[in-house]
């Protein structure tokens, strides 16, 4: 998911497998972005939501196509938030092109709604929802995701999330 991106992601697959190369090159064409430069080279764009989401989904689907090419096919797919798009595409619910172009638009809209540096998220590990609600009371932070037992994500203005994180 978002936050897991890093320069160089998918580069080894791109260089070794034509199937992965095709996904990256097609994404570059569909989005009119140089996905190789975005994903493989150090740059400031990779951490901006409007680029991050397309980069992560492109990388995920490129790797999945290589796995599929080697005869492995999932019986079930699942994803959370951004990962849902990969899961849906892998399951055949949408094309690779639609998944990548949709998350690019999603990222642009999210960036417009909350420009870089204004909002934040933090995973809280080991506290239950009631305790977290007590901690964030009086701040502008909110509960966002119940990821799994023992991990809840808070979100809000950057200063509110930082304030809640210190508590």
Where are these regions (language model features)?
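Helix-rich "cap/lid" substructures immediately adjacent to catalytic or cofactor-binding pockets
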Residues: 3-78, 154
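Alpha/beta catalytic cores of group-transfer enzymes, especially the acyltransferase/condensing modules
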Residues: 3-5, 29-31, 91-167
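Hydrophobic side chains within alpha-helical segments
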Residues: 56, 63, 84-89, 109
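Alpha-helix C-terminal capping segments
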Residues: 65-70, 88-94
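Short amphipathic alpha-helical patches
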Residues: 37, 50-54, 62, 90, ...
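Gly/Ala-rich beta-loop-alpha elbow adjacent to hydrolase catalytic centers
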Residues: 60, 75, 79-83, 87, ...
């Amino acid at each position: 998911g978002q936050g897991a991106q890093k320069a160089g992601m998918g580069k080894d697959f791109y260089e070794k497998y034509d199937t992965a190369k095709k996904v990256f090159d097609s994404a570059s064409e569909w989005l009119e972005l140089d996905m190789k430069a975005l994903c493989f080279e150090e740059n400031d764009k990779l951490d901006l939501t409007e680029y991050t989401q397309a980069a992560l989904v492109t990388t995920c689907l490129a790797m999945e196509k290589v796995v599929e090419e080697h005869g492995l096919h999932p019986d079930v797919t699942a994803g959370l938030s951004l990962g849902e798009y990969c899961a849906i595409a892998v399951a055949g619910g949408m094309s690779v092109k639609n998944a990548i172009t949709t998350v690019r638009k999603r990222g642009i809209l999210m960036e417009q709604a909350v420009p870089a540096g204004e909002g934040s998220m933090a995973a809280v590990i080991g506290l239950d929802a009631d305790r977290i609600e007590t901690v964030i009371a009086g701040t502008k932070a909110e509960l966002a995701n119940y990821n799994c037992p023992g991990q809840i994500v808070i979100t809000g203005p950057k200063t509110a999330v930082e304030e809640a994180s210190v508590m």
